[in-house]
């Protein structure tokens, strides 16, 4: 795929000297990927959308070309039946150091208008950026991460002097609809240390995040005439659902939660004839708080059963959606980032994310926890979205140094 004409014209006007050779390479790759409409579908996540498969095929072709040009034996890439792209580059050292995994995602959000995406190259505060014409999203989330990962693969394959352990890459579908790890092959992708290229603010690395559960309770009512309700054992599902919601202390609600505090959030009710289902979000960082919330949920159900004996109660959903990566994070992951950042003169801020990441979804499926690295994206999930090439290059440099640091681990 070639540059869109308008992007080429603006790029030529800016001049290649406006950015480094690395940025030039990443710009070409990013614009190619951004021009592919790879929105995921929340209602029909599987099989993956045609645009995501197009992205997967474009990535595989690029990696195959890089492998063919290199002298690296044993490097492989494949697309799974479910649309995941896996890349493996074997270690080029004899040391038994940990394997390193890098993840990102193929899809872009369905929450904003996609379709005929027209990437435009521009400048902002002296940096080269890529934006849209304001009528569609750009897909910087996470085509910035994809571009950085592909550039890292090219560099490692073309520079055998860079010593490294086994490297594993996963380009995942359906992240923006919360399904990135649903069909991941943990036999193919199961690194000892994981980093996710999907962050926004420059220099920020997410070291922990919410654990997220979906907890849905159905209240099955029993109809009767109100005038004879007691004799006919009237079961009021609406009243029971209201009592269930009211059981949770106001202090446990999201509007009273900050920092590393979690919350219980009954956020939606659905009604089907006599039955009412309460849909609840449960979020926490610390396992001890999660155990407290478990007791609160069980207590709420027991209380409603006692107060409304004619209403049957069913827990219809109790799913772990994503997990705090800190639970299983490699003990030297933070040191790796700090050492790598120091070598390139970068100031890093470690944060606790009140949300989830691709790595958090993977952790919920049994993989080791992974930090999330900034990737040069801004104003994501909107038609104001843009990508900053200098910040993408900075993320690339940080990850390359992390790769070089791995052999020092035992």
Regions of interest found by a model, annotated:
Residues 94-162, 166, 171, 394:
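Active-site metal-coordination/substrate-binding segment of hydrolases
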Residues 1-7:
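Sec-dependent signal peptide recognition
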Residues 121, 125-136, 174-295, 299-302, ...:
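Midchain, well-structured core segments that form catalytic/ion-binding scaffolds
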Residues 239-256, 263-265, 312, 320-374:
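Active-site-adjacent substrate-binding region
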Residues 9-17:
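Hydrophobic h-region of N-terminal signal peptides that target proteins for export
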Residues 19-129:
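Acidic/His- and Gly-rich active-site-bordering loop/insert found
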Residues 34, 272-274, 347-401, 406:
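Zn-dependent metallopeptidase/amidohydrolase metal-coordination segment
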Residues 70-78, 161-166, 250-265, 304-317, ...:
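Flexible, glycine/charged-enriched surface loops at secondary-structure junctions
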